[in-house]
């Protein structure tokens, strides 16, 4: 079953959840703030996604900005970035939709249609 990981107060997450419901796609819901992704999960999702690791960061979030990660990330290794992401779910871009052979980061409807319909 599809894993849907989001922050319920996030409007983009709300749109994605509505889209899943309207398209009758079953999913397992997980609140990223109360159940932070583990280092192991993040590593697996990163490898499965084929995306640059920076795409997993919530660059518009307050925590990202207050930690000045825009200037720090270029000097960090993948291992350091994954460990940092695992410290707080609010650093992670959301929503995440995780299937057997794919990971969708953020809600871009065209990408979701391609993978989920």
Question: Language-model segments: what does each one mean?
Answer:
Residues 1-23, 27-32:
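Local sequence-structure signature of Cys/Sec-based thiol-disulfide redox active-site neighborhoods
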Residues 34-117:
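Thiol/selenol-based redox catalytic cores and closely related redox-interacting motifs
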